[in-house]
């Protein structure tokens, strides 16, 4: 009996010891759950946006509701953003003065975000002002991280002490380390090459993304291990992007060791499943707050492994209720915009300008093919009319696909709708400029539209005051086979090569057109000039901003809004369908292939003639040699 009791005691003692070791075994062998909530490319879309099918998506109040629901399920979740949090709605007009975007993100509990190219649209002066305004507000703010895109340092050209002071005042860092639920996270920001190309006036210096990212990962990991004795989860907020499963962020993940997750912004990509490369997950949730991305991982800090448990993109749509607190903040910010900005134009945020019963191109359709677009006809016609109303005789106006951010909805079209559609600008909200070009360069602009669009869809141009036709089978830079000025009275005029013509466009498109000669390596050029024919540099275009009769700059969005408001309540029926100002067709008819041929076609024809002549000469030589050889045998 005593032996039995001893055995039972021994077994009980063993069980007690085993149970006491279980927590240790779990801590050492089992992974810890990690949840990352993310967005990117929010573009100041505080309010819901219109779907192509008539529905709505996004809106920060709805987004906040879903964030709270996910945090209720995952209390230790972190919330991050991949940049381009600004520029895309009327709220951007308060960017320099009030920093509405960062303040709202702070209220929503964002842990960190990074800079995208559009954060530099107001140039360094606007960025400095915005950062200081954010701090002065006293509101909670997300940590800003960027590791490879900083201003020139003291002693370098372009050094700006105030810019550095604003960055330091906000507390912008290469990376940040945060702890949540016993897990440490390293979060750092990366700026991509294409993003840099899209921010040519930022005044910042781009360091190599790969080299900087690897150095940042190594330094931050060491700091975390030295200070906290543990391996961190490493998250890169990258404003570089992917395309077709590849792209800059794919190359970044492939080249840099140690990144667990890349939040990939800039390209407005939706990834239904993560891209996995070099043990790194690349994730994207679409633009404008369409979805909240949710990544659930199992992280073993001892083995330094991160395993994907689940990945979800939660739609932010009409089924989601508004969060009352964020909705109230947005309404307050709307009043801010009306008082500080819209009051100068005598309009209000939700003012209905016109009713629209026509379905216009979506932005994707604008980009998709070379074509005439009723939506873009409205925009270019509005530019021309606004500048003519300012007392300037205009021959033509143009807009580019790349500056059109949204379509106009069916039904009531508001001031906010118009601004959202034409919100892309350089430095401010996009002023119109009036410059002069020769007839030859005006034809070159038509060729840029016809020849470059298949290679770069954002370069498609849409004109007012010109009608032309494009044969897609003709030679590059000679695809336009017919072009005439379309005068206000409906008559047509020849475009004379040496004559100067007044052309109106937005500042952004004007700068891009001025760089055509450089980007085409001299093959084709468009030189903006003043009324006397003197060439203008890109920096001089600001001196040609159009002013209205009261001396105020004419904005792209306001030109469109005024044009619509003058339509007496309904969109003019002439915009129900295209009017033939751009005709695109394909023909191999020799007459149509050679009609109005220019130097590019003649050069190719000359090359073909020379090649044919060489072939003929070679064949003749071979035949003569054969005949001579045969004669010698006889």
Regions found by a protein language model. Name each.
Residues 1-12:
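Bacterial N-terminal signal peptides that target proteins for export
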Residues 11-20:
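Bacterial N-terminal signal peptides
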Residues 17, 110, 150, 164, ...:
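A residue-identity detector for tryptophan
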Residues 19-30:
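Sec-dependent signal peptide cleavage junction
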Residues 25, 243-250, 254, 327, ...:
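Short secondary-structure boundary segments
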Residues 28-319, 375-378, 382, 436, ...:
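Acidic, metal/ion-coordinating pockets
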Residues 30-35, 45-48, 53, 64-72, ...:
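Catalytic centers of hydrolytic enzymes
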């Amino acid at each position: 009996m005593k032996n039995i009791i001893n055995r039972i005691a021994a077994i009980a003692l063993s069980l007690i010891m085993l149970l006491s070791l279980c927590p240790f075994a779990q801590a050492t062998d089992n992974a810890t759950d990690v949840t990352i909530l993310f967005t990117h490319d929010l573009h100041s879309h505080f309010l819901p946006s219109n779907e192509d099918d008539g529905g709505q998506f996004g809106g920060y109040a709805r987004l906040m509701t879903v964030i709270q629901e996910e945090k209720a399920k995952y209390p230790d979740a972190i919330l991050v953003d991949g940049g381009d949090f600004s520029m895309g709605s009327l709220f951007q007009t308060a960017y320099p003065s009030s920093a509405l975007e960062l303040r709202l993100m702070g209220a929503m509990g964002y842990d960190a975000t990074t800079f995208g190219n559009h954060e530099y649209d107001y140039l360094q002066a606007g960025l400095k002002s915005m950062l200081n305004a954010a701090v002065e507000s006293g509101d909670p703010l997300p940590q800003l991280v960027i590791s490879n895109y900083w201003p020139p340092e003291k002693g370098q050209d372009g050094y700006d002490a105030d810019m550095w002071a604003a960055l330091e005042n906000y507390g912008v860092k290469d990376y940040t380390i945060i702890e949540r639920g016993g897990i440490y996270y390293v979060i750092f920001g990366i700026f991509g090459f294409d993003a840099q190309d899209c921010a040519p006036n930022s005044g910042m210096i781009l360091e190599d993304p790969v080299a900087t990212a690897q150095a940042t990962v190594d330094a931050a990991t060491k700091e975390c291990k030295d200070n906290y004795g543990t391996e961190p989860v490493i998250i890169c907020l990258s404003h570089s992007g992917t395309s077709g499963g590849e792209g800059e962020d794919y190359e970044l993940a492939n080249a840099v060791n140690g990144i667990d997750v890349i939040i990939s912004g800039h390209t407005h990509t939706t990834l239904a499943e993560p891209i996995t490369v070099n043990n790194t997950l690349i994730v994207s949730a679409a633009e404008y707050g369409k979805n909240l991305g949710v990544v659930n991982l199992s992280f073993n800090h001892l083995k330094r492994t991160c395993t994907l448990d689940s990945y979800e993109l939660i739609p932010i749509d009409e089924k989601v209720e508004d969060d009352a607190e964020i909705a109230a903040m947005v309404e307050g910010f709307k009043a801010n915009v009306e008082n500080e900005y819209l009051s100068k134009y005598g309009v209000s945020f939700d003012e209905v300008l016109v009713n629209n019963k026509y379905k216009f191109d979506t932005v994707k359709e604008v980009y998709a093919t070379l074509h005439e677009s009723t939506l873009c006809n409205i925009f270019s016609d509005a530019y021309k009319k606004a500048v003519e109303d300012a007392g300037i005789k205009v021959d033509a106006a143009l807009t580019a696909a790349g500056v059109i951010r949204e379509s106009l909805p069916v039904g009531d079209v508001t001031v906010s709708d118009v601004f959202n559609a034409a919100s892309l600008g350089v430095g401010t909200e996009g002023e119109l400029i009036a410059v002069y070009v020769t007839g030859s360069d005006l034809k070159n602009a038509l060729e840029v539209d016809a020849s470059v669009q298949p290679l770069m869809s954002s370069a498609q141009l849409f004109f007012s005051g010109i009608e032309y036709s494009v044969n897609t089978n003709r030679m590059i830079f000679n695809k336009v086979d017919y072009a005439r000025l379309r005068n206000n009275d409906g008559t047509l005029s020849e475009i004379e090569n040496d004559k100067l013509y007044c052309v109106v466009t937005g500042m952004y498109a004007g700068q891009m057109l001025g760089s055509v000669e450089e980007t085409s390596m001299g093959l084709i050029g468009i030189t903006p000039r003043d009324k006397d024919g003197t060439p203008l540099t890109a920096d001089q275009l600001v001196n040609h901003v159009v002013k209205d009769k009261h001396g105020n700059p004419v904005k792209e969005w306001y030109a469109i809004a005024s044009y619509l408001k003058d339509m007496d309540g309904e969109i003019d029926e002439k915009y129900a369908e295209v009017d033939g100002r751009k005709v695109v067709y394909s023909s191999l008819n020799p007459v149509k292939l050679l009609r109005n041929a220019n130097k590019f076609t003649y050069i190719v024809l000359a090359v073909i003639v020379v090649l044919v002549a060489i072939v003929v000469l070679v064949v003749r030589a071979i035949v003569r040699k054969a005949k001579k050889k045969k004669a010698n045998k006889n």
